[in-house]
């Protein structure tokens, strides 16, 4: 039988509260029509399907958790044609929280930014899936195609944040 210390109980309680506050903030942003194009995008354009931008997810993660969580990326596969990246979130004192996996096809000659900048786009998508997995906002998880359509503006937003 595992015995949970008072410190672990307190940390878990605080983590649950931070996750709850993060969800509340993201739901508020999704419901705000003025945040269209800034915090979320409609996919397909003009539809009622609202998807949070990765830059928004990262900002809320930083605002709610400060520096208590570690977001790491690991290249799982990288060759001439494609890249697969896994992002993981863990607590700074240890303990896995969530993960996200993304795959992108490469073509440096393509006019498609997703293929030209496959590693950057793949990492952005993996981050988004990882953070959304932790905060679990909405009723679905974006498909690769949906993420592809929204990642281009995310890349520019993340550059502004970092």
What is the predicted function of each stretch?
Residues 1-162:
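Polyanion-binding surfaces on beta-sheet-dominated domains and ring/shell assemblies
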């Amino acid at each position: 039988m595992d015995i949970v210390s008072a410190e672990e109980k307190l940390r878990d309680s605080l983590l649950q509260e931070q996750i709850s506050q993060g969800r509340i903030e993201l739901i508020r942003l999704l419901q705000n029509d003025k945040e269209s194009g800034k915090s979320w995008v409609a996919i397909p354009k003009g539809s009622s399907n609202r998807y949070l931008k990765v830059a928004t997810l990262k900002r809320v993660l930083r605002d709610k958790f400060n520096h208590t969580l570690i977001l790491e990326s690991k290249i799982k596969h990288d060759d001439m044609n494609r890249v697969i990246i896994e992002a993981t979130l863990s607590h700074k004192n240890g303990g896995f929280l969530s993960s996200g996996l993304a795959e992108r096809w490469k073509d440096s000659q393509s006019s498609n930014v997703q293929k030209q900048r496959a590693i950057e786009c793949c990492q952005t998508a993996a981050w988004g899936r990882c953070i959304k997995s932790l905060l679990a906002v909405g009723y679905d998880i974006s498909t690769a195609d949906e993420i592809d359509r929204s990642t281009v503006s995310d890349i520019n937003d993340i550059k502004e944040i970092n």
